[in-house]
């Protein structure tokens, strides 16, 4: 099991809790607002907004919430002004971490992210030193109880997906950024609901962690980064050694 798979499990559990208190809607709403601000409120002419709306629908965000978020971005409704932040970070044992955030005050968010890193053996990195270790991919996570693996592979790959990974309770569909929208739309059209869907950074090379205490610190760091109110996604290149997998099930 890779670090990404393990983190996917943690993230799914966290998202299940978040959804009960509306945190996911808040995060997705920010993404919609930023997209509308940058490219206008018409999804047909704004691919980024179209993708953000697809993501909102995949987590069952109410239509009224989506429309309000768009209007905040276009200025039709008053609201705070958001901006995107991308933090390149190093964690314990030199693991690489990419943190994406949307904030209304970068001067607040950056020190808070830095503080989380410092307390748990991490640090902010210089621009380009970490991002070169990752590439952007479309990632769609589905509960495996919804569809058989062979049927999903036929459907997803037929629409341009690069890979379908069976992780037991869930499938992880990987696409290029360009094919992400068509694959997600095809899955939605078949009535398949995604637990998570976004274009995010994926590590090109993994970094194995074999020390239990270091692994605990890494997991805690990523949980705290992802728990920050302004953070929209966290991706790392760590991979748990086989000897530690049962410790973190």
Swiss-Prot record:
Compartments, as annotated in UniProt: Cytoplasm
Protein name: Probable transcriptional regulatory protein LBJ_0543
Domain of life per record: Bacteria
Pfam families per the UniProt record, alphabetical: TACO1_YebC_N, Transcrip_reg
Signal peptide boundaries: none
Keywords: Cytoplasm, DNA-binding, Transcription, Transcription regulation
GO cellular component terms listed in the entry, alphabetical order: cytosol
GO biological process: regulation of DNA-templated transcription
Molecular-function GO term, any one: DNA binding
Cross-referenced SUPFAM superfamilies: YebC-like (SSF75625)
Similarity comment text for this entry: Belongs to the TACO1 family.
């Amino acid at each position: 099991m890779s670090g990404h798979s393990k983190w996917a499990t943690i993230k799914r559990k966290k998202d299940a809790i978040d959804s009960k208190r509306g945190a996911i809607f808040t995060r997705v709403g920010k993404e919609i607002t930023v997209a509308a601000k940058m490219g206008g409120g018409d999804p047909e002419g704004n691919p980024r907004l179209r993708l953000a709306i697809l993501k909102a629908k995949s987590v069952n965000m109410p239509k009224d919430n989506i429309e309000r978020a768009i209007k905040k971005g276009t200025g039709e409704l008053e609201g705070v002004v958001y901006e995107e932040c991308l933090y390149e970070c190093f964690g314990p044992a030199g693991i690489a971490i990419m943190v994406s955030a949307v904030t209304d005050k970068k001067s607040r968010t950056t020190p808070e992210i830095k503080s989380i890193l410092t307390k748990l053996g991490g640090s902010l990195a210089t621009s380009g030193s970490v991002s070169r270790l990752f590439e952007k991919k479309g990632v769609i996570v589905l509960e495996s109880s919804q569809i058989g693996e062979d049927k999903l592979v036929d459907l997803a790959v037929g629409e341009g997906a690069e890979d379908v990974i069976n992780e037991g309770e869930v499938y992880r569909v990987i696409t290029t950024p360009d094919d992400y929208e068509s694959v997600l739309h095809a899955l939605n059209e078949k009535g398949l609901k995604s637990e998570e869907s976004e274009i995010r950074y994926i590590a090109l090379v993994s970094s194995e962690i074999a020390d239990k205490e270091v692994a605990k610190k890494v997991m805690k760091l990523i949980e705290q980064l992802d728990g920050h109110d302004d953070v929209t996604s966290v991706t790392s290149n760590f991979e748990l050694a086989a000897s530690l997998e049962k410790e973190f099930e």
